[in-house]
């Protein structure tokens, strides 16, 4: 009899088999499910506190996605040989899981919930993020924690005009789309994607396709819950004090309505603070006992009702616009004098100072991912300091939100970057958000494109982004173009679309409610396209095309090709040759396995010198050609002459002069510069040289020693021997 009460469910999902297990591992967690998809194994655990902390006024959900290096048969490369802080991929996956599950916890549920996902086995062809989302959905569903799930999730590719379910790494190389969608049976809740300039129709079709495929996982989770689910918690939302709500509403509504007639964000925020303080003072003055946290929550609800009702009634939005108008746009290029490329993009009260820097291949980011190492030559970083929203705050390590916004902007731009062959630079773009009132990530896309073009990057097309919002009550809804920060907080959807005049390059959607239909998404996409075209027009006016020359402060890249067999000659013993080249020419030199050499230099003359020296090193000695070089070594039977860098030839004693040479040192000295002709080379690379082939033959010299000469020499040799004998 086993001590485990193990329950297993398996199902076929496209061409993959999915197995879900619970009851054996991590039994003390509120819920734990192991998901195996073709050898990619993920363990998701969830623990919920039975009681909320006193004074808690928000839902404290934490999602931690962790990849274990042993999952891919690796040992961590750090000094301590253990997993350290989360990688960028782990942070992004944590956000990907958090976004669709957060709206499904009931309103007023403020108990702490911690979701931890471990990837413990990885098949490189099966992404762990989809397995993790299914495992989390199942773990929450069996835990008994109040949760209006389960959710399903799927990855969608687009290959040869057809949608592909959960494509692996290999299939994605030929796919025009990488889209992840998550949602319940009834509605889509989250979309994250990048695309190769695809139409709105294709993108919407991918969302619908992925949502339908996700329902297969939802059905399997329902079966798992039926056999292994724990009792649902007996949790009820706190009872509402209607009398107190009416009291606060009476005190606050007029002041809040007046505040939302103010168009400036700073002035409006100040008016809202004063309204809140006034309500608290009035309650104190009347002797009413209250919890300040609850009062603030009530004020937020009143604000939401005011703003939402005004928009649905067709009244102007918070800043006076209608639902389709984009805020005023100002663009300035080449803002910073010594950077490689820069742009200041301002849209209303949202502003991004975006800077592009060009580097060499050595500057590429080397990423040691679980599925394998690779180099990333396009880096995008997004920073948003507290002053951007007029707040006091701490400056510290990069936050999850900043990593997520940077990745979204990168997804939007990467489809329009030139290939490595066209533009071999490593590119880093940094977006500094200097003002923020909604849609700063999309301002980063616009500013990023302009700064890249300012840096001389030949972009395939201008790329612009826009954030859309939604207000929905029953059957009435309004789609909002270019949402403000307040409209984001008070609305039902955050829908970001980036692309070119030809199509969409990135799409991100987060929906806070259920019931968003395909028709609503169609309206949102059509309205987003209209706004995108408007912004693209403004960008094209400011910068019609990329600069034809890169900044004088950026490194210039020059490429050349050598025989791959000559690579070791350029590198030299222990790297001595390549080090000398870089030190003496002031260039960076990168050599690839196929013999492609990239020279990075700030001046053309330095690059030319490096190229000349590499050509010398890699040049082949030609038979019949005359070379001039120093004598490097004197031998008894000849001398070694340096013809090319690292290439010597043998000048035999018989080839030094037409007359007989008794001693090489009588004719040559080390360091002496001589002219020689190449007589022949053999298959081992040995070179035979001649000096006498270049010298005029003495008059009457047949080239053979005369008999008398030969006799005299014999006599001298004989005489010498006799003298020795006599002695």
From Swiss-Prot:
GO terms for molecular function: 3'-5'-RNA exonuclease activity; magnesium ion binding; polyribonucleotide nucleotidyltransferase activity; RNA binding. The keyword Metal-binding applies. Residues 707-720 have a biased composition (Basic and acidic residues). It catalyses: RNA(n+1) + phosphate = RNA(n) + a ribonucleoside 5'-diphosphate. Its cofactor is Mg(2+). It holds the Pfam family S1. Its EC number is 2.7.7.8. One of its GO terms (cellular component) is cytosol. The keyword Magnesium applies. It is an enzyme of class 2 (transferase). Residues 555-614 form the KH domain. Residues 624-692 form the S1 motif domain. Residues 691-727 are annotated as: Disordered. GO terms for biological process: mRNA catabolic process; RNA processing. It is found in: Cytoplasm. Mg(2+) binds at residues 488, 494. Keywords: Cytoplasm, Magnesium, Metal-binding, Nucleotidyltransferase, RNA-binding, Transferase. Involved in mRNA degradation. Catalyzes the phosphorolysis of single-stranded polyribonucleotides processively in the 3'- to 5'-direction. Belongs to the polyribonucleotide nucleotidyltransferase family. This is Polyribonucleotide nucleotidyltransferase. The gene is pnp.
